[in-house]
């Protein structure tokens, strides 16, 4: 069933909107109706109708500039939804061997039909991880990182460790998740920016001893923590 044909009052659709608002806001963006439509792949009128109902039901507020924000109840519900999704992603990748993109899609399907008790047991069985497979924190848990910057912003000669892949990439650049996994870039990977690539739209990096050319558009979704000279991965 397409997103356009669902009734916005259904639980799964409410959950989807709340999760989307949570994730966009978590990336530091202002959440506007146009951004929701872009992220979710639905029309502006569909989003407008959904926003009215979410406001009516007390899940979100809308400001004079048309930006939306979760209410306390909305934030609590959204965090619960995101927690379920990220725990399932971790289980699917770590225990069942799914790749990142497939795990994200399967977690979407499973999260609305599995009970809280099962989620809690899955969480315990995989050691209560701090993050999803892409390094995004499971709500209520706090990975200890230093300041994070985009890999695209590192200068030649800089070394860093990958901490997370932006949630934006999961929804707007899904092929990126698969390609990053294929070339060995994931949470905890150490990278060195060696020099500017001949193609101005790329940068050259070393990962696990291999030199790779990575598109800047991909590198901007990869959040890294800068390393000192003693930690140089080359």
Model-predicted regions and their roles:
Residues 1-41:
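Extreme N-terminal segment that seeds HTH/winged-HTH DNA-binding domains in transcriptional regulators
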Residues 17, 36, 47-57, 180, ...:
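Basic amphipathic alpha-helical segments that dock to polyanions
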Residues 33, 51, 89:
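Helix-turn-helix DNA-binding elements, focusing on the entry/boundary residues of the two helices
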Residues 45, 101:
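Key DNA-contact positions within bacterial/archaeal DNA-binding proteins
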Residues 55-65:
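A short, conserved structural fragment
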Residues 66-85:
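Basic, amphipathic "hinge/linker" alpha-helix immediately C-terminal to the N-terminal HTH DNA-binding motif
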Residues 111-221:
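Mid-protein regulatory/catalytic core that forms ligand/cofactor-binding pockets
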